[in-house]
UniProtKB/Swiss-Prot annotation:
Protein name: Co-chaperonin GroES
Family: Belongs to the GroES chaperonin family.
Record-linked HAMAP family: CH10 (MF_00580)
NCBIfam families documented for this protein: PRK00364.1-1, PRK00364.1-2, PRK00364.2-2
Gene3D superfamilies for this protein: GroES chaperonin (2.30.33.40)
Keywords: Chaperone, Cytoplasm
Role this protein plays: Together with the chaperonin GroEL, plays an essential role in assisting protein folding. The GroEL-GroES system forms a nano-cage that allows encapsulation of the non-native substrate proteins and provides a physical environment optimized to promote and accelerate protein folding. GroES binds to the apical surface of the GroEL ring, thereby capping the opening of the GroEL channel.
Subunit structure: Heptamer of 7 subunits arranged in a ring. Interacts with the chaperonin GroEL.
Location (main, coarse): cytoplasm
SMART domains: Cpn10 (SM00883)
Compartment annotation: Cytoplasm
Species in which this protein is naturally found: Buchnera aphidicola subsp. Tetraneura caerulescens
Length: 97
């Protein structure tokens, strides 16, 4: 199945979170938590402004981002993997290495 996001929505594949604490203790289950980093898989055409023009998104496919998994985030299955669909405003930063 292929999912194409609309407008200012972005599809993100969550990165695996580190399963060790700062002290080196291995965390399991819910103690490990969910990562708020992910890779952008697809982006919509852009946000529609009040004047009707379309502002393209700042993120692009392949970007690694830090996001806020807020109430608007939607979890879906795509090619047997869990992905998140959220708006660009839920993305807090682009990770540059």
């Amino acid at each position: 199945m292929n999912i194409r996001p609309l407008h200012d929505r972005v599809i993100i594949k969550r990165q695996e979170s580190e399963s060790k604490s700062a002290g080196g203790i291995v965390l399991t289950g819910s103690a490990a938590g969910k990562s708020t980093r992910g890779t952008v898989l697809a982006v919509g055409n852009g946000r529609i402004l009040d004047n009707g023009s379309v502002k393209s998104l700042d993120v692009k496919v392949g970007d690694v981002v830090i996001f806020n998994e807020g109430y608007g985030a939607k979890t879906e299955k795509m090619d047997h993997e869990e992905v998140l669909i959220l708006t660009e405003s839920d993305i807090l930063a682009i990770v540059e290495e």
